[in-house]
Amino acid sequence: MKLKLVAVAVTTLLAAGAVNAAEVYNKDGNKLDLYGKVHAQHYFSDDTGSDGDKTYARLGFKGETQINDQLTGFGQWEYEFKGNRSENQGSDKDKTRLAFAGLKFAEFGSFDYGRNYGVAYDIGAWTDVLPEFGGDTWTQTDVFMTGRTTGVATYRNTDFFGLVEGLNFAAQYQGKNDRDGVQEANGDGFGLSATYEYEGFGVGATYAKSDRTDKQVNAASNFNANGKNAEVWAAGLKYDANDIYLAATYSETLNMTTFGDDHIANKTQNFEAVAQYQFDFGLRPSIAYLKSKGKDIGSWGDQDLVEYIDLGATYYFNKNMSTFVDYKINLLDDTNFTKDARVSTDNVVAVGLNYQF
């Protein structure tokens, strides 16, 4: 019975997005939840950039206030503290992951603004479920609307105005962020996503298009794209029931995806697939395959940017404590391209303990 309760708790935890919040306040229509985790981990690799201590902690809150029977206000903030820095280095590389606020209008959907996930990640998240790695062929932080990003206004509708259970859609606008680092800059853009889930099965698609900044266009080189617009489309399938999780996504990007030493590919074709099983006693093994093919990379032509098999496992002691191992088997060969572009070709093993509340 105890083992079954662990499995139920883990399944609930995963369905909730790996956030097991502690309720701090709930009175008179106002609610505040606090959540966080300590992720103690170490990487082993011949690649010096992917070797060593990678410990960090995260802390966040979710709040909501009931304005009336049809209108609810909400907000969320999340911050990451690096645990592998010396005390003299202080808060170097600490970062705000999420910071947004919005309004929910009953069955008519919600609107929010701030630093949030781009709508393209609605599909990318389906395969970004590995113990440590994964989700890195086309969903990237601060790269347009493919991951966490800034200055996004998002409208979301659940169950299609309350008429079709499981049918969700979103529309998003992102304002210009003209940063010095061209890999993290973006012009004005919009994105759309739609998903439908029924009895464990899910299907979804997304599309986003943005202007590129002048700095991005002018940074064109033998490795960097020179197009004036960045685009992505993606489609995905998943099955999540009976302790089984299966998911696959296919996507194509244009003038968007970063690779190697901060380069931007003209075009990529990306595939990700993952399979997991949740045992009653807390073990969750995982296997995945990911590949990103770069197209028309300057004089280099078509090149593999990412390709690896991932073997991993997580063991949940309970809903708050887990341990994991994740082995990234890199299938890329050492070539003149990978050396010049500084694309890693080494294997990586990650091991760690995770406490979350």
UniProtKB/Swiss-Prot annotation:
GO terms for molecular function: porin activity. It is a multi-pass membrane protein. Its main location: membrane. It is found in: Cell outer membrane. One of its GO terms (cellular component) is pore complex. Keywords: Cell outer membrane, Ion transport, Membrane, Porin, Signal, Transmembrane, Transmembrane beta strand, Transport. Pfam families: Porin_1. Residues 1-21 form the signal peptide. InterPro entries: Gram-neg_bact_OMP (IPR050298), Gram_neg_porin_domain (IPR033900), Porin_dom_sf (IPR023614), Porin_gammaproteobac (IPR001897), Porin_Gram-ve (IPR001702), Porin_Gram-ve_CS (IPR013793). Belongs to the Gram-negative porin family. Forms pores that allow passive diffusion of small molecules across the outer membrane. This is Outer membrane porin protein OmpD. The gene is ompD.
